[in-house]
Amino acid sequence: MKTALLVLLVLAVATSPAWALRCHVCTNSANCKNPQVCPSNFYFCKTVTSVEPLNGNLVRKECANSCTSDYSQQGHVSSGSEVTQCCQTDLCNERLVSAAPGHALLSSVTLGLATSLSLLTVMALCL
């Protein structure tokens, strides 16, 4: 009797459908908590952050069949570049964001413009 139950249990597990990965899927920063079931051959949740100093970071989240993460330090991502982060558990891309926040980059741009304007003012006064 125990053997029959064991065989039934093994058959039930072997024939049950595999659980698909669930990821947040969105195309912009405004709607980035949107859980969806990924296709069966997609094994990664992928977050791609485009660094845009004037518009802030643009975030895209999706299911992916392959993914390679980029690693960067805060403040070392140049404007116009993208940072990719990957994970492999359900809804793991909910909180993944770029290591270079848009506000920090915007502050750097503002500081650079202020410095340039100051130098131009000093040069104009010296002439």
Swiss-Prot record:
Transmembrane feature ranges: none
SMART domains: LU (SM00134)
Lipidation (GPI-anchor amidated serine): 98
UniProt-recorded name of the protein: Lymphocyte antigen 6D
CDD domains per the UniProt record, alphabetical: TFP_LU_ECD_Ly6D
Pfam families, alphabetized: Toxin_TOLIP (PF00087)
Gene Ontology terms describing biological process: lymphocyte differentiation; response to stilbenoid
Function: May act as a specification marker at earliest stage specification of lymphocytes between B- and T-cell development. Marks the earliest stage of B-cell specification.
